[in-house]
Amino acid sequence: ATSLVAEFRSFDLIVAVTGEWNVDVLLCDLQSRKTGIPPIIFGWVEPNATAGHAVLLDSSDDTACLRCGFSDSGRFSRPVTKWPEGAEMFQEPECGAVFSPYGPVDQAWSQALISELSINTLVGRATAKDYHIWVGRKDRVEQLGGDWNEEWISIHGNPELGGRVIKTSWMSSASCGARHETEAA
């Protein structure tokens, strides 16, 4: 692990899009401990790829903490969309496998969002805690059985028909715990 951290220091940027919460927490913790790793862009999609997120966190900002926006188990606290239980995943007939019905076209919006933030970071046009949100089309969300999340609307406003990018700053939470424990250590 020590050699991996040393190798990270030679990078200009880390883009974390694995969807593995434990990996994201490790990267967040390494950065908060001022280990010299570069800025990190975390990216993820919501169910059915109907919304996407990209956040830039940099150790130059002591309040930059990915965990502030997630539960301890990695559930995002402010999704754009909401879904009835079970509507996010479908089961294949005659098989135990489950899947979310989206593909490359649906993901393209989120990939572009993450790519744009990555390029802006590398050329110096982004700052720590930049947070970009792709809000998919309302008709697609409704077609798949979802809706806009009222809590998200109360913070960011009604996206109406969707199909837009929102640029804001990443949240900080005094109740985050994990971030504040590493600062006290």
Predicted segments — roles?
Residues 1-3:
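S-adenosyl-L-methionine
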Residues 6-13, 18-185:
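Glycine-rich phosphate/adenylate-binding loop
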